[in-house]
Amino acid sequence: MSAYPQDTYFNSNPYQQQPYAYQPPPQPQPQQPPYQQQPYQQQAYQYNAQQPYQTTDPYAYQQSPPQSSTVPPQSPPVQVTHSPFIRTDSSQAVSFTDMARMAGRPQTFDEMYSVPESFLEIEIRNPMTHGIGRKMYTDYEIVCMTNIPAFKLRHSAVRRRYSDFEAFRDILERESTRVNIPPLPGKVFTNRFSDEVIEQRREGLQRFLEIVAGHPLLQTGSKVLCAFLQDPAWDKSQWI
């Protein structure tokens, strides 16, 4: 027999296995579905009178509201085309002051005092009757002021009678087939030397020259236009 008691032997054994406490296995956790990024959806547009570009999208740009809703909307400025040809008749003339007023803006210093880029002023005035009996006729003074290069003189004054205007119009029709030449005032057979008839004819000749001399095709393509308006020695027999 061993010299040590049995209970002392088992207690002193260093390799004796200790009793194992049972632990249940961990329960499996339910699996979460994988994360899926939702596609970007644009929010519907909502109209707002105070802020017409407002949307429900938090990332959209929001326009700031107007400072005051009582301010009336301003209409766009009126664009006025400045004609290079100014009519000399005071009832039909359009000055730079009138054009600035029509445009809705104050007139500038340059518009008040500068010379227009191109202008043409024609005036028929001072009718005079010459001769006696059947040889009586009336001629008119044509005053022309311009800075258009097509005209040789900046200021000129010549006298023409009605028959000169008739020849001038016929020559223009032959020279410029693409331009419709306006008619002359009609002939008068009774009381043609009265003041009323002469004034009516003067106004008709004035309108005729304003249309003809202001036409750009006639200014550059006609040879008789400048000569008729500015040459004192103009003779219709040289052009017929």
Swiss-Prot record:
Residues 22-33 have a biased composition (Pro residues). It is a peripheral membrane protein. Coiled coil: none annotated. Residues 118-235 form the PX domain. PROSITE patterns: PX. Residues 34-54, 62-84 have a biased composition (Low complexity). Its main location: cytoplasm. One of its GO terms (molecular function) is phosphatidylinositol-3-phosphate binding. The PX domain binds phosphatidylinositol 3-phosphate which is necessary for peripheral membrane localization. Required for retention of late Golgi membrane proteins. Component of the retrieval machinery that functions by direct interaction with the cytosolic tails of certain TGN membrane proteins during the sorting/budding process at the prevacuolar compartment. Binds phosphatidylinositol 3-phosphate (PtdIns(P3)). Belongs to the sorting nexin family. This is Sorting nexin-3. It comes from Cryptococcus neoformans var. neoformans serotype D (strain JEC21 / ATCC MYA-565) (Filobasidiella neoformans). The gene is SNX3.
